[in-house]
Each structure stands twice: as C-alpha cells, then as structure tokens.
Amino acid sequence: MAHIEKQAGELQEKLIAVNRVSKTVKGGRIFSFTALTVVGDGNGRVGFGYGKAREVPAAIQKAMEKARRNMINVALNNGTLQHPVKGVHTGSRVFMQPASEGTGIIAGGAMRAVLEVAGVHNVLAKAYGSTNPINVVRATIDGLENMNSPEMVAAKRGKSVEEILGK
C-alpha cells in the first residue's frame, strides 16, 4: 500500500495511492493516472502532493514535487502530539490524540503514512466519514496544522508557559 524511500535530502517519501482514471471521447477512452504522495523529514515537517499524468511514473514524480513544495511545520512533543486535535476536509473527519511512549502509531491507511513521515511515533487516531485517501490526508494535515504548542498558546495569550501548563 504505502511505499517508502529515502532521498539525499533526508526526506521520507511515501506513495499512498495510484489510481487509473479515464476520459471518454468520441474515439474511445483515454486513460490517465493519479498519484497521492506524502513527504516528510521525520522531525515535524510534512507535505502532500497529488499528481496527474498519462503514465504512472510521471504522475508519481509530479505528486512528489508538489509535496515538497507544500510542506508545513508541525510542533511535536517527544514524538507525539501536543494535545488532542480534530481535522476536517469535505466528508472526512479525523481525530488524533497523544499517546504514551511505546504505543506506536494506531491509525489506518493514509493517516498512518502522514503521521509516519511527520515524525510522530506514538498516537491514537481515527478517521470518520469518508475514507477517500485524498480527503483523509487533507483532514490529517488540517488537524496537524491546527495543533498549538504551549509556547504558541502562551505567546498568543501573553502569559508564561508555566501558567499555560498549570505548573
């Protein structure tokens, strides 16, 4: 399902889905391919790409390039999330919550690939609604983008990190 390879820049690349689509014209059908990929450095940076082309390798290459261009930073907390987060994209809803050391990535399919390349090692996650890989990936990235570190919350509220954490 998910194919992984290391690159010179130490980015992890995962191929989540390849799909054959067709366009019907007067002379018959024209087939093309779509590819969904995620790219991450395993340390809080992650991006996804969706490429379309007449051949599979070209679609994968386009998707990888788009993924590298659209990377976001995720504030992780020792290999897990800062707090429980929800992400939504069209019909897909995802819920992710931090887990203790040794739990692993408890998530399905497309969500697992995103969390692995982002550098999350311990998380409990569930996808609700549509399980279309494109929508699940977008919802997962939406949830990760909406996650705030205690430092970010403290800066927004004008308080110290200790006040936010209740220490």
From Swiss-Prot:
Changing residue 112 to S: In strain: NEA-319; neamycin resistant. Residues 11-74 form the S5 DRBM domain. InterPro entries: Ribosomal_Su5_D2-typ_SF, Ribosomal_uS5, Ribosomal_uS5_bac-type, Ribosomal_uS5_C, Ribosomal_uS5_N, Ribosomal_uS5_N_CS, Ribsml_uS5_D2-typ_fold_subgr. The keyword Membrane does not apply. One of its GO terms (biological process) is cytoplasmic translation. GO terms for molecular function: rRNA binding; structural constituent of ribosome. The modification N-acetylalanine is found at residue 2. One of its GO terms (cellular component) is cytoplasm. It holds the Pfam family Ribosomal_S5. Keywords: Acetylation, Antibiotic resistance, Ribonucleoprotein, Ribosomal protein, RNA-binding, rRNA-binding. HAMAP family: Ribosomal_uS5_B. With uS4 and uS12 plays an important role in translational accuracy. Many suppressors of streptomycin-dependent mutants of protein uS12 are found in this protein, some but not all of which decrease translational accuracy (ram, ribosomal ambiguity mutations). Located at the back of the 30S subunit body where it stabilizes the conformation of the head with respect to the body. Belongs to the universal ribosomal protein uS5 family. This is Small ribosomal subunit protein uS5. It comes from Escherichia coli (strain K12).
